[in-house]
């Protein structure tokens, strides 16, 4: 239901942008295009069912951003934003005893550590609303929309042999994920976030944003014959972006 609602919101804004010249008497017409690049950090995990104890997996993201601003309706600046990002996501297991103490491997003498790194090409499309200055100064914004991801590759980091794990001291005995490769190469979900933008007419736009993504698909099969009933990605992104204007609305009253 949430996915349908987000799609309706995005379609409504896209239709609004395409019809903006015909509705200039309702809102203040804009036709502005900006292009740029950004990057940041990604904190991610996988929602396994049965549950796998985890801490946040740390990764990086970088990519291109395209923004089309179509209208200012009362105080809200309406835009559509599309991105293409290279993102490092995954999960990092929290291998503990019942006393919440890290499990020590009896062979290596080291605390057992397991991490799966997965690389995706992520493509979100956002409906964006902003409030504040457009040409010079600060603007707060909120954006939400669908996101798809294309799986590129994966890598495992572990400091013990799975057959020689210290199973006796582990709280969780779920290890199926440790030997399974990604089965579903296409990911999809809903992303949304908020941030602050600073604009200068001769320099461009600088954006700082926090974003959350919730995957609606699974990386593994989820039928009755499969081990996991759910295995969806979720992540938090902290991102900096720079945009420069390709096209501006010819209106000296825009501040």
Regions found by a protein language model. Name each.
Residues 8-18:
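Sec-dependent N-terminal signal peptides
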Residues 20-24:
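Sec/Tat signal peptide C-region and signal peptidase I cleavage site
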Residues 25-32, 71-78, 132-139, 200-205, ...:
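Short loop/turn motifs that connect adjacent beta-strands in outer-membrane beta-barrel proteins
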Residues 25-67, 243-245, 255:
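Short glycine/proline- and aromatic-enriched beta-strand/turn motifs that initiate or cap beta-hairpins
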Residues 37-41, 62-70, 86, 123-131, ...:
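Residues on the lipid-exposed face of transmembrane beta-strands in outer-membrane beta-barrel proteins
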Residues 45-57, 89-121, 151-187, 218-235:
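Extracellular/periplasm-exposed beta-strand and loop segments of Gram-negative cell-envelope proteins
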Residues 57-63, 79, 118-124, 139-141, ...:
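Transmembrane beta-barrel architecture of outer-membrane proteins
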Residues 89, 187, 192-255:
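Predominantly the C-terminal beta-signal and adjacent terminal strand-loop region
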């Amino acid at each position: 239901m949430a996915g349908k609602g987000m799609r309706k919101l995005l379609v409504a804004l896209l239709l609004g942008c395409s019809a903006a010249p015909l509705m200039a008497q309702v809102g203040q017409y804009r036709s502005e295009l900006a292009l740029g690049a950004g990057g940041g950090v990604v904190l991610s995990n996988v929602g396994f069912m049965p549950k796998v104890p985890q801490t946040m997996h740390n990764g990086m993201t970088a990519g291109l951003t395209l923004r089309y601003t179509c209208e200012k309706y009362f105080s809200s600046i309406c835009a559509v934003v599309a991105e293409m990002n290279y993102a490092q996501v995954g999960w990092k297991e929290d291998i503990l005893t019942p006393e919440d103490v890290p499990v020590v491997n009896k062979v290596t003498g080291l605390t057992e550590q397991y991490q799966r790194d997965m690389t995706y090409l992520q493509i979100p499309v956002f409906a964006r609303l902003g409030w504040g200055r457009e040409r010079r100064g600060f603007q707060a914004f909120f954006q939400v929309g669908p996101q798809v991801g294309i799986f590129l590759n994966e890598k495992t980091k572990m400091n013990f042999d799975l057959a020689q794990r210290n199973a006796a001291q582990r709280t969780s005995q779920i290890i199926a994920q440790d030997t399974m490769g990604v089965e579903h190469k296409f990911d999809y979900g809903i992303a949304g976030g908020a941030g602050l933008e600073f604009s200068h007419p001769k320099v461009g736009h600088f954006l700082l944003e926090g974003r959350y993504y919730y995957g609606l698909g699974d990386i593994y099969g989820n039928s009755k014959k499969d081990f996991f009933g759910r295995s969806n990605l979720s992540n938090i992104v902290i991102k900096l972006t720079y945009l420069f204007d390709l096209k501006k609305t010819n209106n000296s009253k825009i501040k």
